[in-house]
UniProtKB/Swiss-Prot annotation:
The NR LBD domain and the nuclear receptor DNA binding domain are sufficient for binding to the NGFI-B response element (NBRE) 5'-AAAGGTCA-3'. This is Nuclear hormone receptor family member nhr-6. Transmembrane segments: none annotated. GO terms for cellular component: nucleus; transcription regulator complex. The lineage of its organism: Eukaryota, Metazoa, Ecdysozoa, Nematoda, Chromadorea.
Length: 619
């Protein structure tokens, strides 16, 4: 738009003598004023966002000395006064916008290039023409106010402390792309903490990235009706609650407790082994449950060989029965729950006075094979010293001790699952072939680091020097093995039970040297136990290899035991079981094995009579 020409003093008479309609000026008619207003409105609506210093430049141009002074004329018309009042209102509006923009915005001052990009249409000066404002002028001004309604509302709204707050730190007026110049006092982002006074159009995006409409009643609720805090004091308290660590929680996925917490609840209160449910008033494993039950039913009395402070855990819980029973009582196991007499056929329950009726009503899940075998080991192991023999004794007492060990070993093996399914004839052959090796394993487990004494299943403690000469070699070799036995493998009940079972099945060779009548059944039992041990040692293949190697090493005790029996046989009446053992074939289990000569010492070398398939193919 061309800049309005400045009127000279020569036109003063013309203005004074002519009507406003006859004045030859760009502002002399109502249409010219409306055209300029229309241009201004179109620029605001269609052009790029207004720069920050736009109103400052407009105010600077309007404050320059004009070519027409409204005050120079004495009797001015009402139209001139109306024009002067309108211009003054617009100037006041521009000044207010500039002041509020300077107070709120902290963006850097626009560069020289941005200043030079101001459209030329806005570099004009206000006209000093004197004319009468028609009624359409007021309508045009009202139209401008309606177009700039969001901006004007900031000054027409009642006082509110929220709108006097500082603008958001990321507010940038140059980044606005609305159809109008927004209120500088409002933040440029949509926040539930600031009331939004702009109508939401159909082209705007909702909180979920989908198009929302102002007519939609099921979309995002209006921030004016939100329950969130809408004032700075409330907002500070609202945000402060998120900064308090006490208000924050760290639950696991889907509200499920962590695995560590679940494992801690499934530990036996007596020996820290795996426990599934409550037994007799406390969470205990199956082994401690059976031990406590047998102790109460048989009214057993135990004595401690130490100072009554023996450690009770899953490795050494069978070492001292006295301390184990005392710990059962300490953790809350109740003797009254154990079934006696006529109660043996139904679940034992406490009376209403004890209020512990849920002790044994919870059924236990089925246990795996090695767990059942480990339970049999614990049920048939005695770790309590009953008598001590430090004086030398003869061969008859030695045979009585060995005979008692044989019956205890047979009872233990018959209590193990799978092994008890073997036919009696084959069971007797395998027991005779593995008896001395199994006795050495159990002695090593009972003796520990003892160097001068040995304890048997009967609870009798003997000095090494008290044994007859024919048993000295095998007994001392047992004690030597016991010194390092506990440190070779982590002997929990499952691994220890599998070790004994594999030692019992050592005579089952590929060529059936022992002459088993139902070898396929024995092969099936042996394969089942090996697979169970493989699964049990899945996290430590080294442990599996150690157990297999120890099975070969302990097989040498069979030859040592035969040497002692061969010495006693001519002069002593041997029990029937020992006679069966002596008459058992002594053919080597493998072609590389040779039977030892009678009376010759046998060194505990790595070679053995055990024909067990080593390597990955066996597992």
């Amino acid at each position: 738009m061309e800049q309005l020409s400045i009127q000279t003093d020569e036109l003063q008479d013309q203005f004074s003598n002519c009507s406003p309609a006859s004045v030859d000026s760009s502002y002399s008619s109502c249409s010219s004023v409306e055209d300029e207003i229309e241009i201004y409105t179109r620029l605001v609506r269609n052009e790029e966002p207004l720069r920050r210093d736009f109103f400052r430049e407009m105010s600077k141009n309007s404050s320059c000395s004009s070519s027409f002074d409204y005050g120079e004329f004495g009797p001015s018309s009402s139209s001139r006064k109306g024009s002067k009042t309108t211009d003054a209102d617009l100037d006041s509006l521009f000044h207010s916008l500039v002041e509020t923009s300077d107070q709120v915005n902290t963006v850097p001052k626009p560069t020289k290039t941005e200043v030079e990009s101001i459209p030329e249409e806005f570099e004009q000066k206000p006209s000093s023409s004197s004319h009468r404002l028609p009624s359409e002028m007021n309508a045009s001004i009202t139209h401008i106010k309606s177009e700039l309604d969001p901006t004007m509302q900031a000054f027409q709204m009642p006082h509110n402390d929220l709108f006097l707050a500082t603008a958001a730190p990321h507010y940038n007026p140059f980044a606005l792309s609305n159809d109008f110049m927004p209120n500088p006092l409002m933040p440029s982002f949509t926040s539930p903490f600031y009331p939004q006074h702009f109508p939401v159009s159909d082209s705007r995006r909702g909180s979920q990235g989908t198009t929302s409409s102002s007519n939609n009643t099921g979309g995002t609720p209006s921030p004016h009706s939100s329950s969130l805090p809408t004032s700075p004091p409330q907002l500070q308290g609202f945000l402060r609650s998120f900064l308090n660590p006490d208000n924050l929680s760290t639950p696991t996925s889907f509200g499920v407790p962590s695995e560590t917490a679940l494992d801690a609840d499934k530990m036996c209160a007596v020996c820290n082994d795996r426990a599934v449910c409550l037994h007799y008033g406390a969470r205990t494993c199956e082994g401690c449950k059976g031990f406590f039950k047998r102790t109460v039913q048989k009214n057993s009395k135990y004595t401690c060989a130490g100072n009554k402070t023996c450690p009770i855990d899953k490795r050494y819980r069978s070492r001292c029965q006295y301390c184990r029973y005392q710990k059962c009582l300490e953790v809350g196991m109740v003797k009254e729950i154990v079934r006696h007499g006529s109660l043996s056929g139904r679940r034992g329950r406490l009376s209403s006075k004890t209020k512990l009726a849920r002790s044994e009503d919870q059924p236990s899940p089925p246990l795996p094979l090695l767990a059942l075998m480990g339970k049999a080991i614990e049920d048939h192991t005695n770790m309590t010293v009953v008598r001590q023999f430090m004086q030398p004794f003869d061969e008859t007492i030695a045979l009585r001790i060995l005979h008692g060990e044989l019956h205890a070993t047979k009872k233990l093996l018959m209590a193990m699952p799978q092994i008890s399914e073997i036919q009696p004839a084959d069971f007797q052959i395998l027991l005779s072939r593995s008896f001395f090796a199994i006795m050495a394993i159990r002695v090593a487990n009972r003796c520990g680091n003892s160097t001068d004494t040995i304890m048997f299943e009967s609870g009798e403690l003997f000095s090494l020097n008290a044994f007859p000469a024919c048993f000295q070699q095998i007994i001392r070799f047992m004690v030597d093995k016991a010194r390092t036995f506990s440190s070779l493998v982590d002997w929990e009940p499952q691994a220890f039970a599998a070790f004994i079972a594999l030692q019992f099945l050592a005579g089952n060779t590929e060529h059936n040297v022992l002459g088993l009548t139902n070898k396929p059944l024995v092969d099936q039992v042996q394969s089942t136990i090996i697979n169970a041990l493989k699964d049990h040692c899945s996290g430590s293949q080294n442990k599996l290899a150690k157990i297999v190697r120890l099975t070969q090493e302990f097989d040498v005790f069979h030859a040592l035991g035969l040497q002692a029996l061969d010495i006693l046989y001519p002069s002593h009446q041997l029990p029937e079981e020992f006679m069966f053992l002596i008459n058992l074939t002594r053919a080597p289990l493998r072609s590389t094995d040779a039977p030892p000569a009678c009376g010759s010492p046998v060194a505990p070398s790595g070679s053995s009579l055990f024909n067990f398939q080593m390597g990955p193919a066996a597992f």
